[in-house]
């Protein structure tokens, strides 16, 4: 009956990429450097990651399966450990957020007229919209009319940002 869990994992998608003691956090515009331990960068001296996930349900038929929301993991991410989140132990109302004092505002997302969002299965459409709403562009790039591309699950998504709104211009299945 826990509502949230901690998931400790390995940043396997950047394994072997190396690390630097100073990184450029997107929340600072991508131009200012900070010590890697003061950030959530995956490029660390060890590949360990930690995420707090909403535990939506647990299935126990044929093994144990946890259904979670809010994951910032790649498919196939190696999970090392799972622990319950205990608000009375871990929630610190007087904690200082450092350089991330203001939460980011999600972008409004629209689909270009020539694209039929209805042709995508609803879970894929929702995943694409939620991913683009987080504004995945490099923080220092805010060029109107520039088309950005990113992989979301088995799709390549092309989008642009104009006046604080994301417009999805193309979605193509990626052959894998």
UniProtKB/Swiss-Prot annotation:
Its EC number is 2.1.1.-. One of its GO terms (molecular function) is tRNA binding. GO terms for biological process: tRNA methylation. It catalyses: N(6)-L-threonylcarbamoyladenosine(37) in tRNA + S-adenosyl-L-methionine = N(6)-methyl,N(6)-L-threonylcarbamoyladenosine(37) in tRNA + S-adenosyl-L-homocysteine + H(+). Residues 1-94 form the TsaA-like domain. Pfam families: TrmO_C, TrmO_N. S-adenosyl-L-methionine binds at residues 12-13, 40, 50, 74-77. Keywords: Methyltransferase, RNA-binding, S-adenosyl-L-methionine, Transferase, tRNA processing. S-adenosyl-L-methionine-dependent methyltransferase responsible for the addition of the methyl group in the formation of N6-methyl-N6-threonylcarbamoyladenosine at position 37 (m(6)t(6)A37) of the tRNA anticodon loop of tRNA(Thr)(GGU). The methyl group of m(6)t(6)A37 appears to slightly improve the efficiency of the tRNA decoding ability. Binds to tRNA. Belongs to the tRNA methyltransferase O family. This is tRNA (adenine(37)-N6)-methyltransferase. The gene is trmO.
């Amino acid at each position: 009956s826990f509502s949230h869990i901690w998931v400790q994992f390995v940043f396997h998608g950047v394994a072997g990429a190396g690390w630097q003691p100073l990184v450029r956090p997107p929340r600072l515009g991508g131009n200012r450097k900070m010590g890697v331990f003061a950030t959530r960068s995956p490029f660390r001296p060890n590949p360990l990651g930690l995420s707090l996930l909403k535990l939506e349900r647990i299935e126990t038929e044929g093994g144990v399966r946890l259904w979670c929301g809010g994951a910032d993991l790649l498919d196939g991410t190696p999970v090392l450990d799972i622990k319950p989140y205990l608000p009375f132990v871990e929630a610190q109302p007087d904690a200082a957020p450092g350089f991330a004092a203001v939460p980011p505002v999600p972008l409004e997302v629209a689909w270009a007229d020539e694209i039929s969002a209805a042709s995508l299965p609803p879970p894929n459409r929702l995943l694409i919209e939620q991913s683009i709403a987080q504004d995945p562009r490099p923080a220092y790039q805010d060029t109107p009319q520039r088309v950005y591309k990113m992989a979301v699950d088995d799709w390549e998504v092309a989008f642009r940002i104009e006046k604080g709104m994301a417009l999805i211009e193309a979605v193509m299945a990626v052959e894998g």
